Amino acid sequence: MSHASPYENNPLLANLTLGQKTDYIAEYSPQLLQPVPRQLNRDALNLAGNLPFHGEDLWTLYEISWLNNKGKPVVAIGEARIDAGSINLIESKSFKLYLNSFNQTRFADLATVRHTLEQDLSKCAEGAIKVALYPLSEAAHHIGTFPGECIDDLDIVIDEYHFSSDWLEQAGDNHTIVEETLHSHLLKSNCLVTGQPDWGSVVIHYKGPRINREKMLRYLISFRQHNEFHEQCVERIFVDLQRHCQPEKLTVYARYTRRGGLDINPFRSNWETAPANMRLIRQ
């Protein structure tokens, strides 16, 4: 069963720079950041009051550069952890444009840049933000792998590519309680505004009734023509798994390929803390 889109003709999305021709500003401009209320998606998921999960959106910033006090360029790799309890998520194109505005701006040192990022991002998200910046000599993002078993090699026939949570109906086996970790690299959704493809991998760690792997894979593949932001997709997966399969403990963590020098990696759980950053092979 498909769900009605809460986004169609929504005025909260009308003024986003995403999907529009924009000028690239090279002088520090925090006003370029644009928020999107998280509640826009959560209302459609019937999430009000206390959330059934905690977590964060872990962004990796690959293209950040500024000038030191002598005018010499500095480059770094950054991480921004945006609490899932913040009022807003940050729209990714506006984040890219904001980072570009550092390019011709002088900063005293790396700590000043980090503080500036935290201050601006916290204001936009209206929530807690933690930022780390690393000189390239100290950045150690080794290519890793997701834990658990990959379900992508299941030999199944797929002829439906429209999103539906119905694939998860009766997917939980209440007679068999397990703790297991499953992952898939077949997650694909599309940008909510532009329709451009978003490629991701997702890992699901749960304790509860054993989830039918074929049904889970069909469900994940059904995102293939679904238009939603990364963060919203992960929260939808969490809520659908919890609603249909009723695990006692659940973690959903996705890592998406980068666009515009940024990758977004949403983490949601009711029992675990967010992991250290890493890179998958496609990142």
Swiss-Prot record:
Active site: 191, 198
Entry's Gene Ontology molecular function annotations: preQ1 synthase activity
Transmembrane portions of the chain: none
Keywords for the protein's UniProt record, in alphabetical order: Cytoplasm, NADP, Oxidoreductase, Queuosine biosynthesis
Residues that coordinate or bind substrate: 90-92, 230-231
Gene3D superfamilies xrefs: 3.30.1130.10
UniProt key word Chaperone: no
Pathway this chain belongs to: tRNA modification; tRNA-queuosine biosynthesis
Principal location class: cytoplasm
Annotated compartments: Cytoplasm
Cellular component GO terms, alphabetical: cytoplasm
GO biological process assignments: queuosine biosynthetic process; tRNA modification
Binding site for NADPH: 92-93, 259-260
InterPro entries reported in the protein's UniProt record: GTP-CH-I_C/QueF (IPR043133), NADPH_dep_7-cyano-7-deazaG_red (IPR050084), QueF (IPR029500), QueF_N (IPR029139), QueF_type2 (IPR016428)
Catalysed reactions, as listed in the record: 7-aminomethyl-7-carbaguanine + 2 NADP(+) = 7-cyano-7-deazaguanine + 2 NADPH + 3 H(+)
EC number per UniProt: 1.7.1.13
Similarity annotation: Belongs to the GTP cyclohydrolase I family. QueF type 2 subfamily.
Self-association and partners: Homodimer.
The protein's role, per its UniProt record: Catalyzes the NADPH-dependent reduction of 7-cyano-7-deazaguanine (preQ0) to 7-aminomethyl-7-deazaguanine (preQ1).
Protein name as it appears in the record: NADPH-dependent 7-cyano-7-deazaguanine reductase
